[in-house]
Design a protein with these regions (language model features):
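Residues that form or immediately flank small-molecule/cofactor binding pockets and catalytic motifs
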Residues: 18, 48, 92, 113, ...
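P-loop NTPase catalytic core
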Residues: 134-439
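P-loop NTPase nucleotide-binding/switch module
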Residues: 66-68, 82, 95-142, 155-160, ...
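A generic structural signal for well-ordered coil/turn residues at beta-strand boundaries
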Residues: 9, 17, 30, 83, ...
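N-terminal accessory targeting/assembly segments
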Residues: 1-86, 91-95
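Residue-level signal for beta-strand positions within conserved beta-sheet cores that form or flank
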Residues: 9, 39, 64, 83, ...
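Active-site phosphate-binding and catalytic loops of NTP-dependent enzymes
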Residues: 3, 75-79, 94-99, 116-122, ...
């Protein structure tokens, strides 16, 4: 990033840590960019005339007499229709070999939308994954996390959602990705011919961890452009928010801030909320919906990152491996969409809420039957039928590799009801039984 002529140059750094450096400077703003010995940095703390800079590439090789030049602006992204189909790094620079994007330069990390300009979410976001669309329906303008163990195929799930989701634009923000994961997303999107509606901002494990902090703001700035300027439905996919939080912790620790729970900074809640609160439904029709992966350490849902996330978001989606079918499913017991009632049975078929509730109840009966069997108790005929139903339900609907529309999901569920149960055991309104029961 080039500097301008006649800019003031500072050459006396008072303190250097692994990720930050401090010096005395005046007329500097918070979040302002700077060049330190040729490396890009950003102002993260101002105390009087003492300014602390976060150096994205790390401070290795920077002497105390290094030249520091402040650029007079925060990180920016050039927004235009040319963003579509492109891959960028954390600074909004192309990494796909394509040309630079021409467009309006916009500062990233702006405020969330004023509540008076928001509309209550009311549009269905269909993903083709029954564990989401059937049981935990997503609504435009919603913010919801995917909780998953690090060894689960959450990136494949995100890629599937990107290809199947019925939205105008998909924006992927990848933080701490391996090169294999980056190439996986790139190849999947290219082979599916879907690049024209997908925009990706990627930080890999080969890039400095601190750069991850820019990825969500880059992705959301692009999302705001398409949602506001073009009134489009935009789905933002962020993976992995735990990597983002780890980068926050790195900067916080190297600034000698007192850590909070699980070594995370005390500002973690605000840092996460600033991202998630960008989800919005505009009265004009445009919307930003956020799905973000949060990996769990040893399945610990009480860790500071998922714990704070749960207070901010409108539900959560849990991935787990089902030992009976050997596939990863969306767990119906631990998953929840707090806004599904806004579209379930209204934007979908009228029998949707009752079918969803009945299926989950029968799946719970199967879980109880499995516990009885494991403890050596005899199973009733109903228990055996419930277990058989649960296996088919997981395989044909809950598994993440299943791709159906909501009407097909409901029809498959009705087929399973009639295969294993009597109408009175399913406990659904007679008008729906008369119309949809498979005879």
């Amino acid at each position: 990033m080039a500097t301008k002529a006649f800019q003031k140059i500072y050459t006396k750094i008072s303190q250097i840590t692994k990720a930050t450096c401090s010096l005395k400077a005046t007329g500097v703003g918070y979040d302002e960019l700077a060049m330190v010995n040729g490396k890009l940095a950003q102002v993260v703390k101002i105390a009087g005339d003492e300014v602390t800079l976060q150096v994205f590439e790390g401070t290795e090789g920077i002497p105390t007499n290094a030249e520091v030049v402040f650029l007079g602006k925060s990180p920016t992204l050039k927004v235009s229709d040319q963003l579509a189909g492109r891959f960028f790094n954390a600074f909004g620079e192309p990494i796909d070999g394509g040309p630079e994007v021409e467009g309006t330069e916009v500062e990233i990390g702006g405020p969330s939308v004023n509540p008076v300009r928001r509309k209550q979410p009311s549009e269905l976001i269909a993903t083709g994954i029954a564990g989401i669309d059937l049981n935990n329906t997503l609504v435009s303008g919603q913010k919801i996390p995917f909780f998953a163990d690090p060894d689960q195929t959450f990136n494949q799930v995100m890629a599937n959602v990107a290809l199947r989701a019925e939205t105008d634009k998909i924006i992927l923000g990848g933080m701490g990705m391996t090169n294999d994961d980056y190439l996986y997303f790139k190849n999947v999107f290219s082979n599916a011919g879907a690049l024209d509606r997908i925009i990706s901002f990627v930080n890999t494990t080969e890039n400095p961890p601190v750069e991850r902090l820019l990825i969500p703001d880059m992705a959301l700035t692009a999302a705001e452009y398409f949602a506001v300027e073009h009134n489009q439905k935009v789905l933002v996919l962020l993976t992995d928010m735990t990597s983002y939080a780890d980068a926050l912790a790195i900067v916080s620790n190297r600034m000698d801030q007192i850590p909070s729970k699980d070594s995370m900074p005390g500002s973690l809640y605000s840092d996460l909320a600033k991202i998630y609160e960008k989800a919005v439904q505009f009265p004009s029709g445009g919307s930003i919906t956020i799905i973000a992966v949060t990996t769990l350490s040893g399945g610990d849902i009480t860790h500071a990152v998922p714990d704070n996330t749960g207070y901010i978001t409108e539900g959560q989606l849990f991935l787990r491996r089902d030992s009976d079918i050997g596939k990863v499913i969306v767990d119906p017991f631990r998953s929840l969409s707090r806004l599904k009632q806004l579209v379930s049975g209204k934007k979908t078929r009228k029998d949707h809420p009752q079918v969803m509730n009945a299926a989950v109840r029968l799946y719970a009966d199967a879980a109880n039957a499995k516990t009885k069997m494991e403890n050596g108790f005899d199973l009733t005929n109903y228990d055996e039928r419930a277990l058989a139903f649960a296996k088919d339900y997981a395989n044909q609907l809950l598994a993440i590799d299943v791709n159906l529309n909501t009407t097909e999901m409901l029809d498959v569920t009705w087929g399973l009801f009639s295969k294993y149960f009597k109408p009175e055991e399913v406990n659904i309104k007679k008008e729906f039984v008369d119309q949809y029961w498979k005879k």
